[in-house]
């Protein structure tokens, strides 16, 4: 019986499981009921992967906004020639 995807797994694990399911389904040698269960799990994994990508995109947008809003100051440290 196919397991439901854990919501805490990372994107790479989700993608690997989804690729494995796709390979099984493309083989065409699964009985109908098992193929349907695999397909259902694949849909859940695809949804989870999409959510992970959207979360990552939102985090990137937040980081970029913080960077754009931050003032740029001249560096006051030593230069490469040893001068202060």
UniProtKB/Swiss-Prot annotation:
InterPro entries: Exonuc_VII_S (IPR003761), Exonuc_VII_ssu_sf (IPR037004). It is found in: Cytoplasm. Its EC number is 3.1.11.6. Its main location: cytoplasm. It holds the Pfam family Exonuc_VII_S. The keyword Signal does not apply. GO terms for cellular component: cytosol; exodeoxyribonuclease VII complex. Keywords: Cytoplasm, Exonuclease, Hydrolase, Nuclease. It catalyses: Exonucleolytic cleavage in either 5'- to 3'- or 3'- to 5'-direction to yield nucleoside 5'-phosphates. The keyword Iron does not apply. GO terms for molecular function: exodeoxyribonuclease VII activity. GO terms for biological process: DNA catabolic process. It is an enzyme of class 3 (hydrolase). Belongs to the XseB family. Bidirectionally degrades single-stranded DNA into large acid-insoluble oligonucleotides, which are then degraded further into small acid-soluble oligonucleotides. Heterooligomer composed of large and small subunits. This is Exodeoxyribonuclease 7 small subunit. It comes from Haemophilus influenzae (strain PittEE). The gene is xseB.
